[in-house]
Structures are given as C-alpha cells and as structure tokens.
Curated annotation (Swiss-Prot):
InterPro entries: DNA_Rcmb_RecR, Rcmb_RecR, Rcmb_RecR_Znf, TOPRIM_dom, TOPRIM_RecR. This is Recombination protein RecR. The gene is recR. GO terms for molecular function: DNA binding; zinc ion binding. The keyword Zinc-finger applies. It holds the Pfam family Toprim_4. Keywords: DNA damage, DNA recombination, DNA repair, Metal-binding, Zinc, Zinc-finger. Residues 80-175 form the Toprim domain.
Length: 199
C-alpha cells in the first residue's frame, strides 16, 4: 500500500534536510500529521516567512533581513580586519568568544571538487571585491581544519596574496580546559609546531 501523494511529497521534501534519509523523513511526516499538526503549521509558516524575508548581506554574505546586516552596519567594528568563515554557524561561534571585533565574510560552503563545489560556488568573486575595498588590511582565514577547509584556505590565501593582501590563519592546538593525555597526536603535534613565546 502506498501513502497518499501529498504525504509522499512531504516525505520527499523533508529528505532535503542534512542527515535525513527516507525512514527519518517518513517518521517526521507521520509525527507532524498525527501528533503535532499545529507545530507543522507553525513550521510551514515560519519556513515560508524566512524564504520571503531572509537573503544575504551585500557585504559579508551572511543571512540577513536587510541589504546590510547589523554587524556590517555597526560603526564599532574594525573594518581593517576581515575574517573568512565557511558557514553562518562559524561566524556565530566566533562572535560568542567576544574577542574578535572585525568584519566577516561567509563563504556559505567550502571547496569540494568531489562534491562538485568549485570556486564559483563559494562566492569568491564577492569575497575578492570585499577584500579589495581599500579598508581591509588583513584577512583571517577561519575555515575548518578538514581536508576541504584546508584546501579552501590554501586557495583563498593564494588568491588574496597575489593581490597584495596580508593573510593569516587561525591557529590549531589544544582546546581550552583540555588535558594533553586526551588529545589526539595530530592536534598535539600542531600545538607544538604553532607554539608562541611567553611574554
């Protein structure tokens, strides 16, 4: 027996979410229709609203309801620093540290040739325009330390350095509160290589 066409369409739509396969999508659809129809309506309305009003900031490429997001519009930010991150969640994590007061650029992904994601897919043309605006003095690469993140950082650094822009990379090392005996050898080796002099 097959499910009604509208239910099948809902299941297929839910499968677009990361990590959601056919069984999970079917369970979600059953739950929303059987146990939380009100929640399903709120979800549908919220998704529709977000699709209508949320786009990308013209400067940092982060999600925003305005052409220029509040962070980019803030006069308190240091416009000489530009930190490049892969995703909006990375920007949010950096903001939570309350230590960085510069500007951002969100790539909305990372280079991944195996997945068909090339330079055009991560807004590098927009990044180059931003980095060469005459205000930026240093670009900080804060991509993840994954194979794709490293490849992205390398590619972007080559593009920027060829244009005379100073580029730095966030450090790798031990996590705050971490104990050496519980750290993997790769992280420990990197922490030793990237050690700093004590002042």
């Amino acid at each position: 027996m097959r499910n009604p066409p509208a239910l099948e369409q809902l299941v297929e739509a839910l499968r677009c979410l990361p990590g959601v396969g056919p069984k999970s999508a079917l369970r979600m659809a059953y739950y929303l229709l059987q146990r939380d129809r009100k929640g399903a309506g709120i979800l549908a309305k919220s998704l529709d609203q977000a699709l209508q009003v949320v786009s990308h900031c013209n400067l940092c490429n982060n999600f925003s309801e305005q052409e220029i997001c509040p962070l980019c519009a803030s006069p308190a930010r240091d416009r000489t620093l530009l930190c490049i991150v892969e995703m909006p969640s990375d920007l949010m994590m950096l903001e939570q540290t309350q230590t960085y007061q510069g500007m951002y650029f969100v790539l909305m992904g990372r280079l991944s040739p195996l997945d068909g994601i090339g330079p055009r897919d991560i807004h590098l043309d927009k990044l180059l325009k931003r980095a060469q605006d005459g205000k930026v003095e240093e670009v900080i690469l804060a991509t993840n330390y994954t194979v794709e993140g490293e490849a992205t950082a390398h590619y972007v650094s080559e593009l920027l350095r060829a244009r005379g822009i100073q580029v730095s990379r966030i450090a790798r090392g031990l996590p705050m509160g971490g104990e050496i005996e519980h750290v993997d050898s790769g992280t420990l080796a990197q922490a030793l290589l990237e050690r700093r002099h004590v002042r």
